[in-house]
């Protein structure tokens, strides 16, 4: 090679290096590392050149994702871009790791297998950011470990299953965020061999669930089962075979804890649930929201609950599992629940209540099993002094305690309250300060939003349980957009989830009379007349619009707001944002809310119409709503069905629905649209006598199931 050519090549190299060094790029990791220095300089390693990995200690590569998945092990150190090893002597907590990106080499050193896995997870996020922004990997030094050792997500499958492949996708998604546990509320979604009538016809087999458990464990996620025992037992007690085990013969809610056959059934179900979750550490036995009498035995509800708890705790111990028990009923029986949720009382008042009522708990202290974890669940007010007092009572009495926060409680259609980020963060920080071992994020299936809509809350849980108080709420939201949609979408200008909350919150009861709720419609045989709002009267023009003026004003505001949100979502999709399916699910949420507001505004137009032409046009537009809705429903179901099983089996037995769970009110997917379907029926019945009904319109009626 001539000197001139060498000089020219060197010049080109310097120009390329200069471009690399001056180009701006943003690297954000979820969860945020404990210590991180990501400089403005870039290495010589392009993300697509991550090809070979070398371990001086002969450790095996962990399971890898996306941009690190192409790595292959080599015994030739000089060939490797990545050097990795496990060093149990590292001065780091368990699951910790060091990640060092130099100009020519990436070095990962981990405390244990989990730490090695998490080190590569972080590298993968960095490589993805580099690829999306067209730069090499940055020069970086990271020291990282979790603040809470157990960071678990609740999978509640009681009212529906998702497609089997989706659970594998969810495991990958959680593992990428360093979540390491799942509590699987299995109910009737396992084909039980000992009690086959309990398993739903669409339940997964034991081999299917076992395969999911094994896949999760390979990604450092241990799955433990939750099988409700004392209360919330409708999935068992609705079947005639088990009527004799009911505490109240007329109710399918709770077992009789004094009937020894209760334990024969429960232990059979436990056996099978434990078999499909062999890597789990826990057996969650539930036990919340239940008050039994033992068929009028004369024993108190607290005595009976502790009798049951000791029986199941002993079983768990024999199976080498730690039982977890929802702690609300002992606190409620001792009149100590109000200070937990009452944010208006002073600390002194809380102390006074505890001084008066704590002896009621202490009287039963010797009956609280010591091998049990008492799960202090609080989804709305974890910051209260009363909540802390409750947790401290367990700790000072040498009882194990763990918290439970929520990413989904009883919100309809999608989680609200900014995905409950504030409460998730508060409980995580309090758990860290209290030196607790872990925290659970509950995701209740009662109202059954699509799981994609939980992911911002899951990300917040991952962030604050791992990193602690390192990001504000707004910083986390930006981090979520960065990691979920891509670095170019992290700016607040592209945020759309929060601005959906007000329309969704208003949509819930937009068509329902005041002081009622759409979840109660199915319980009322005359809901169409009694619980839905009235319709305009042709002989009393303007009266309807005046009566519902506030409702219509809100409908107009939210109609316009959803139109703005629709443009933002479309912009993200057209711009190539990642996770397009999540955006599509949010689009369906938006379209459903938009429809209800549009229907109200069309009714207002009819009520205010003065000329015959205006009246006729308004009625025609109203009558088109059924066809519009059918198209909307079909589109929503098509999107949701990509991952979700929409309908229950035809032979499924619906239970008594004690807590108004809409997802358990119909066999098919009608429950999701019950208010809209009923309202459309009411509209058609109301208007067909006022003007000739267009026979070309769909007359599909709500099929009550």
What is each residue range found by the language model?
Residues 1-28:
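Bacterial Sec-dependent N-terminal signal peptides
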Residues 19-114, 118, 122-142, 325-330, ...:
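Acidic, contiguous N-terminal accessory segments
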Residues 29-45, 211-214, 263-271, 275, ...:
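Substrate-binding groove of N-acetylhexosamine-processing glycoside hydrolases
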Residues 45-49, 146-151, 370:
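A short, charged/proline- and glycine-enriched loop
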Residues 66-71, 124-125, 170, 390-399:
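Short, solvent-exposed amphipathic alpha-helical segments in soluble enzyme
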Residues 69-73, 179, 221, 321, ...:
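Short aromatic/hydrophobic-glycine micro-motifs
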Residues 90-96, 101-317, 324, 402-405, ...:
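Feature activates predominantly on carbohydrate-active enzymes
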């Amino acid at each position: 090679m001539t000197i001139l050519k060498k000089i020219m090549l060197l010049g080109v190299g310097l120009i390329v290096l200069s471009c690399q060094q001056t180009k701006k790029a943003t690297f954000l990791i979820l969860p945020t590392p404990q210590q991180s220095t990501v400089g403005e300089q870039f290495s010589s390693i392009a993300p697509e050149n991550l090809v070979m990995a070398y371990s001086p200690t002969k450790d095996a590569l962990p399971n890898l994702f996306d941009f690190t998945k192409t790595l292959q092990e080599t015994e030739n150190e000089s060939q490797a871009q990545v050097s990795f090893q496990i060093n149990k002597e590292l001065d780091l907590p368990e699951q910790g790791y060091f990640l060092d990106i130099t100009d020519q080499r990436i070095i990962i050193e981990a405390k244990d297998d989990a730490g090695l896995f998490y080190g590569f997870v972080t590298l993968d996020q960095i490589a993805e950011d580099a690829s999306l922004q067209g730069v090499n990997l940055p020069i970086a030094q990271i020291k990282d470990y979790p603040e809470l050792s157990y960071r678990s997500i609740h999978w509640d499958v009681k009212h529906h299953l998702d497609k089997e492949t989706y659970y594998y996708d969810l495991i990958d998604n959680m593992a990428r965020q360093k979540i390491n546990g799942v509590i699987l509320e299995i109910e009737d979604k396992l084909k039980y061999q000992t009690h086959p009538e309990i398993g739903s016809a669409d339940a997964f087999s034991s081999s299917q669930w076992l395969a999911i458990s094994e896949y999760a464990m390979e990604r450092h996620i241990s799955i433990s089962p939750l099988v409700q025992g004392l209360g919330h037992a409708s999935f068992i007690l609705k079947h005639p075979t088990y009527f004799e085990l009911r505490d109240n013969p007329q109710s399918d809610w709770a077992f009789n804890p004094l009937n020894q056959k209760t334990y024969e059934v429960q232990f059979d179900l436990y056996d099978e649930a434990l078999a499909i979750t062999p890597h789990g550490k826990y057996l969650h036995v539930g036990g919340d929201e239940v008050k039994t009498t033992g068929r009028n035995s004369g024993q108190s509800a607290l005595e009976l609950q502790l009798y049951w708890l000791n029986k199941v705790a002993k079983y768990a111990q024999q199976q080498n599992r730690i039982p977890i028990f929802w702690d609300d009923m002992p606190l409620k029986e001792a009149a100590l629940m109000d200070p937990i949720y009452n944010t208006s009382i002073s600390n002194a008042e809380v102390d006074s209540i505890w001084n008066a009522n704590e002896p009621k708990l202490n009287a039963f202290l010797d009956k609280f099993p010591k091998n049990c974890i008492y799960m202090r669940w609080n989804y709305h007010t974890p910051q209260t002094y009363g909540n802390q007092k409750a947790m401290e009572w367990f700790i000072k009495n040498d009882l194990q305690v763990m918290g439970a926060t929520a990413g989904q409680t009883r919100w309809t259609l999608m989680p609200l309250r900014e995905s409950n980020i504030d409460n998730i963060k508060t409980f995580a920080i309090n758990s860290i300060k209290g030196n607790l071992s872990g925290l659970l994020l509950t995701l209740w299936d009662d109202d059954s939003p699509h799981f994609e809509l939980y992911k911002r809350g899951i990300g917040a849980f991952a962030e604050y349980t791992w990193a602690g108080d390192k990001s504000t709420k707004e910083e986390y939201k930006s981090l979520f957009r960065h990691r979920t949609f891509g670095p170019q979408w992290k700016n607040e200008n592209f945020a759309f989830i929060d601005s959906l909350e007000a329309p969704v919150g208003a949509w819930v009861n937009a068509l329902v009379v005041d002081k009622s709720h759409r979840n109660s419609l199915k319980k009322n045989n005359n809901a169409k007349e009694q619980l839905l709002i009235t319709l305009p009267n042709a002989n009393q023009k303007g009266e309807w619009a005046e009566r519902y003026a506030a409702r219509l004003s809100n409908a107009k505001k939210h109609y316009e707001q959803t139109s703005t949100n629709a443009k933002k979502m479309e912009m993200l999709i057209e711009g190539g944002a990642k996770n397009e399916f999540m955006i599509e699910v949010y689009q369906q949420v938006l379209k459903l809310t938009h429809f209800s507001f549009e229907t109200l505004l069309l009714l207002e137009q009819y009520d205010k119409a003065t000329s015959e032409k205006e009246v006729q046009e308004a009625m025609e537009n109203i009558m088109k709503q059924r066809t519009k809705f059918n198209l909307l429903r079909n589109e929503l179901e098509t999107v949701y069905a990509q991952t979700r099983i929409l309908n229950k089996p035809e032979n499924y037995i619906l239970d008594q629905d004690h807590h108004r769970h809409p997802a358990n009110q119909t066999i098919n997917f009608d429950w999701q649209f019950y208010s809209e379907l009923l309202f459309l029926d009411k509209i058609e019945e109301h208007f067909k006598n006022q003007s000739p009904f267009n026979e070309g319109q769909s007359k599909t009626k709500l099929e009550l199931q």
